[in-house]
Amino acid sequence: YEHLSVVKKIYKKNNIKSYVNSFFKDINNYIGKASLVISRAGSSTIHENIIAGIPAIYFPIKNSVGNHQYENALVLKKNKAAWIFNEEDIGSGIFLKRLSKIITQPELLKQFSFNNKNLGKPFASQRLKEIILSLEVKDV
């Protein structure tokens, strides 16, 4: 929470239209407007961004079980659909330098968006249901 006010000031100073909060209950009202998401790397968040085709900057929680947040984000990074940063990158200035480069390259954001969409499987659960229902149960 301590970084929220700092981030808001930075965006305002640089005339970047943004919605900054620690949690959005009504994420659907915002995700369609976003050209870039900055968030943690939980699986639900990542899948929402993939399906929406929105490139993201992820800050995985260091102490997540099995380092799963980093592993989640790494799949997207390897597919050029997201960037990964550590919390230490905020204080060191690394993050702001990279963020400035990212947001001033619309073609890069467009490419990462395209790559996200290619990773998505929006009808996967429906397809799985169809496969399961099509299986013939045989008497043993």
Predicted stretch roles:
Residues 56, 83-84:
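Hydrophobic beta-strand scaffold residues
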Residues 121-140:
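C-terminal alpha-helical cap of glycosyltransferases
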Residues 27-68:
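A donor-sugar binding/catalytic signature common to diverse glycosyltransferases
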Residues 95, 99, 103, 128-132:
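Hydrophobic "lid"/C-terminal helical patch
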Residues 2, 61-65, 89-90, 118:
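Short histidine/acidic/glycine/proline-rich micro-motifs that form metal-
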Residues 1-39, 70-74, 78, 85-95:
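Donor-nucleotide binding loops and adjacent catalytic segments primarily
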Residues 108-122:
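A short, well-ordered alpha-helix in the C-terminal region of glycosyltransferases
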Residues 97-100, 108-111, 135-137:
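Catalytic machinery of carbohydrate-active enzymes
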